[in-house]
């Protein structure tokens, strides 16, 4: 096995630098705003829902804030890589957006052109509609998108008092906008939905039925998708929860074909429902691993409302991966209120899960929780204490809903800093993290070999796998946040037998990427480090 070196140590050796003592992985990073965190009040009902890391490593913190009249405004804040406020963005670092009524933003994504696409819900107190807002890099609205930068769209089956909500957003290879969430059926039961819009924000009525893909639901209960990802072959995987009864749920994972129909090769006719054994299991976020497996994190609750964090791994076909964790599951019960909100897969295969741990509100005896695992689901003992870190924000409770990973592997978490008088402010914190970068050996049928690695933007890469590269093989490059950066077929590239040769995009930003090749039911991948 090739020796793996940490990125930072490797750079120090190349530069002839003196040895540097690495801070404890999982601890607050004191180089970020000197304390490791930022607390930013807008009003007293603030909450961050999403973190985006730009190519220049500036950080976008996105959520909403309730004003004095309890009306929600969408808020976007931008910070420099060192944690200080970026005064060049919006109004001294903060941009606020309102529509006719409430504007609740739950997710966001950066487009290949550097635009900031926000997704959520607008509420006029009788009905709710899908909300999309697209911003320019400086925080101004992109007036070419939708109606002056805004899309408000009803997608439900009821014509009055409908409830349409977008909880996550992704972009497919064509730049189409794919959102997931929930929408009322004709009986006012929330359905889990995936919907697709054109890059300009127009509902794509050729997708699913009138632009909406869903599954059958029970006559009672609530159902929603909370996370969505696009596979390299264009298929859509969404996770969330399915209402078995009016009060209790099971974890839900569904795969759709590119046209919005259910994929019968996945689970039971496209659907997987998973129950850990408690009365309530819900998926909050999902990520794909390099071999196409699906990781879903969320919660598992007992009938007495003890909440535990849950991480489950499914095979590419939707079966529980019994080799992961304990029979396919990692279960974390640190307190009475453990909630996993976000996942990230590191370039070395490690898994980071973040959320909240402690006692449930209204107390403030809860805070940041970060877990790190090996690729097999065992705790990474180098992280925190026994694989878990519980950083403390003095005098505040902390609820974590968002996570991002910077190019150096450091972990950003965001959400709410809560006072003892129940005032909530925007919170952004950065945690130390240690990870390895290396070219994996070609072993078995899971890995690819890439040279050179590290590379620079516009480098010519050679990628080798263990099979003959077919002309219809799909080559895809993903950023650390899961964003599809580049895709092409091998037929348009130089290739010979088991190798393809191609050039990286000239405007590719420094960072960590995953390079994948998919053909004839197989997927090979490798981590790639791009430097200046």
What are the roles of these predicted feature ranges?
Residues 1-25:
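Bacterial Sec-dependent N-terminal signal peptides
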Residues 18, 189-191, 451-453:
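Hydrophobic alpha-helix-in-membranes signature
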Residues 18-20, 50, 448, 510:
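A composition/secondary-structure signal for short, hydrophobic, low-basic-content segments
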Residues 22-442:
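Extracytoplasmic mature domains of secreted or surface-exposed proteins
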Residues 443-451, 455-532:
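C-terminal outer-membrane/trafficking sorting elements
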């Amino acid at each position: 096995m090739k020796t793996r070196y940490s990125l930072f140590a490797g750079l120090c050796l190349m530069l002839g630098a003196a040895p540097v003592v690495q801070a404890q992985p999982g601890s607050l990073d004191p180089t970020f705003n000197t304390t490791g965190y930022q607390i930013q009040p807008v009003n007293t009902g603030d909450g961050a829902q999403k973190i985006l890391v730009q190519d220049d490593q500036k950080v976008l913190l996105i959520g909403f804030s309730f004003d004095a009249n309890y009306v929600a405004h969408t808020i976007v804040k931008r910070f420099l890589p060192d944690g200080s406020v970026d005064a060049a963005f919006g109004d001294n670092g903060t941009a606020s957006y309102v529509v006719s009524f409430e504007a609740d933003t739950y997710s966001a994504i950066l487009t290949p052109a550097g635009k900031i696409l926000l997704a959520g819900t607008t509420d006029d107190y009788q009905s709710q509609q899908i909300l999309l807002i697209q911003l320019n890099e400086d925080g101004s609205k992109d007036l070419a998108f939708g109606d002056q930068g805004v899309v408000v769209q009803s997608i439900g089956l009821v014509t009055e008092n409908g409830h349409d909500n977008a909880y996550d957003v992704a972009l497919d290879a064509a730049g189409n906008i794919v959102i997931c969430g929930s929408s009322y059926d004709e009986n006012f039961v929330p359905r889990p939905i995936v919907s697709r819009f054109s890059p300009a924000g127009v509902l794509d009525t050729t997708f699913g039925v009138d632009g909406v893909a869903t599954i059958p639901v029970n006559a009672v209960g609530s159902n929603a998708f909370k996370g969505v990802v696009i596979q390299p072959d264009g298929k859509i995987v969404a996770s969330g929860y399915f209402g078995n009864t009016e009060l209790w749920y099971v974890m839900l994972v569904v795969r759709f074909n590119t046209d919005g129909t259910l994929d019968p090769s996945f689970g039971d006719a496209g659907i997987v429902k998973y129950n850990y054994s408690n009365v309530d299991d819900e998926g909050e976020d999902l990520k794909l691993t390099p071999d196409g497996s699906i990781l879903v994190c969320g919660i598992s609750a007992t009938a007495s409302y003890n909440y535990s964090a849950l991480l489950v791994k499914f095979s590419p076909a939707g079966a529980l991966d019994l080799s992961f964790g304990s029979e396919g599951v990692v279960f974390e019960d640190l307190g009475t209120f453990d909630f996993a909100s976000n996942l990230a897969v590191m370039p070395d295969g490690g898994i980071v899960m973040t959320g909240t741990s402690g006692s449930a509100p209204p107390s403030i005896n809860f805070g940041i929780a970060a877990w790190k695992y090996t690729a097999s689901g065992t705790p990474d003992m180098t992280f925190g204490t026994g694989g878990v870190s519980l950083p403390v924000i003095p005098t505040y409770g902390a609820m974590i809903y968002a996570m991002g990973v910077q190019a150096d592997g450091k972990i950003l978490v965001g959400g709410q800093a809560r006072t003892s008088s129940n005032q909530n402010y925007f919170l952004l914190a950065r945690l130390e993290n240690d990870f390895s970068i290396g070219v994996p050996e070609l072993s078995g049928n899971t890995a690819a070999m890439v040279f050179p690695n590290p590379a620079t933007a516009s480098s010519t890469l050679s990628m080798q796998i263990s099979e003959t590269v077919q002309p219809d093989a799909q080559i895809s490059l993903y950023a650390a946040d899961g964003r599809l950066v580049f895709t092409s077929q091998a037929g348009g590239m130089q290739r010979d037998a088991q190798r393809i040769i191609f050039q990286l995009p000239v405007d590719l930003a420094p960072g960590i990427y995953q390079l994948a090749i998919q053909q004839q039911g197989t997927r090979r991948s490798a981590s790639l480090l791009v430097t200046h």
